[in-house]
Amino acid sequence: PATPSRLLRNEVTTISSEEKARLARAAGAQHTVNYREQDAEKEILAIAPDGVDIVVEVAPAQNNPIDLAVTRVRGTIAIYANNGGDEVTLPVRATFSRNLRYQFVLLYTLGQDLVDAAAEDINAAVAAGALRVGEEAGVPLHHYALEDLAAAHEAVENGAVGKVLVDVA
């Protein structure tokens, strides 16, 4: 059940630089933990002693041990990318005894109806001001003309922070 303390928003974001910490705070993170300079597991559990509700993961093969350590009982580990490593090993007893849930999300296999509904909801949230975009909101936008598509791909491959957008109109 939702208790007053569970209703309070308390985002913890792991980052690799002070610049990314600034962007995460602009996007709404209340806490940032630099995983290159700090013991991320220790710092996250100091902020959320019972663990976090959800881990949003982009490198499951590397991070599964810490994900398991910092996710609360009945929590979720949501995976939407694979930045290295094709296999994840799950300690079965430790995982199922805490009723953890792994949720894999791949946009391309959701089905067009769900993609359309999500796009409609996101556009409505942006139009209403409920979802902010741009550097001041922690998500720098990098625009490229359609004829500069190769440069846009290169920006993504080089790890551009934020969103790389190709203008087609």
Where are these regions (language model features)?
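Adenosine-nucleotide cofactor-binding segment
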Residues: 3-63
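Terminal peptide-recognition signature
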Residues: 24, 55, 67, 102, ...
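Conserved helix-to-beta-strand junction in the class I
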Residues: 69-71
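C-terminal hydrophobic helical "lid"/dimerization subdomain
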Residues: 73, 114-169
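Glycine-centered, small-residue-biased loops immediately flanking beta-strands
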Residues: 75, 100
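Acidic carboxylate diad motif detector
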Residues: 80-81
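Rossmann-fold NAD(P)-binding glycine/threonine-rich loop
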Residues: 85-98
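Active-site PLP-lysine loop of aminotransferase-like
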Residues: 106-109
